[in-house]
Amino acid sequence: MRKQIATAALLGAAILAFQAPVQAQDLSKTRYLAANCANCHGTNGQSVGEIASLAGYDKGGFISTMAEFRSGKRPATIMHQLSKGYSDQQIADLAAYFAAQPKK
């Protein structure tokens, strides 16, 4: 019984040890994707111009807006093309990233 508990504890610790680097790597990839948005929407989604800020944007709203750009339902100058370059997972990751950024 003790051997099973020790094995389970060791396995649990190993899972937790490997989970943190994966999350950090995912965040790094998302920041890389978000850097593409910075050209128009500002660093970390905080726009200084007339273009909408993405910082603090609701996750669901971000995903819906990107879907509307993809489908052509929402008018755009460039976003209808850019939105097609991201997978659904990448859009969800960007939505979470920008939602976590403080509004200006």
Model-assigned labels for residue ranges:
Residues M1-A9:
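Bacterial N-terminal signal peptides that target proteins for export
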Residues A8-A17:
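Bacterial N-terminal signal peptides
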Residues L16-A34, E50-A52, I63, E68, ...:
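Electrostatic cytochrome c docking/interface patches
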Residues S28, G60, Q89-A92:
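Residues in well-ordered alpha-helical elements
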Residues A35-T43, L94:
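The canonical Cys-X-X-Cys-His
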Residues C40-S47, A99-A100:
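Detector for the c-type heme attachment site
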Residues N44-P75, H80-K84:
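Gly/Gly-Pro-rich "capping" loops immediately C-terminal to redox-active cysteine motifs
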Residues S71, K84-K104:
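C-terminal capping alpha-helices of c-type cytochrome domains
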